[in-house]
Amino acid sequence: MSAQGKEGNYIMEQLLYLVPVIGILGLLFAFFLTCTIKKQQAGNDRMKEIASYIHEGAQAFLMAEYRILVIFVVVFFLILGIALKSWMTAAAFLMGALFSSVSGYCGMQVATKANVRTAGAAKDSGMKQALSVAFSGGSVMGMCVTGLGLLGISLVYLVTKDAGI
């Protein structure tokens, strides 16, 4: 391999350490957006009451979904570990399922908070403010998925040095 090729590989290896940092930055941005959303007015008492029912329903849905998901994930984890004889691959799957679940949970928490605040902003401040709150709420889920995805994939690679997992 030429000197330039070795230098290129070295640079790529160093850049790989930036990926988890970018993932963490994405999660910090999601946290910032969440704080911004929570500062918005949640509307009048009736709006807050309806929002609490929506939040309660969303929580019930997530818990029912996660009960089924846990069974699937455990069974598939075992199938991967046994069939592929690669517990590292199975562990990477498990970590991905966990990170995905955390993303879904965070997204649902923020979505239920953003919904009532979007309605309140539309009522009190107009469409521009309502859209800002709504887009911020949706962005939290996207940033959580992206941030945790980058963090998970990069950590698996940095620990194993195996892109084939």
Walk through the language-model features, giving the residues of each.
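Hydrophobic packing and interface segments
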Residues: A3-I165
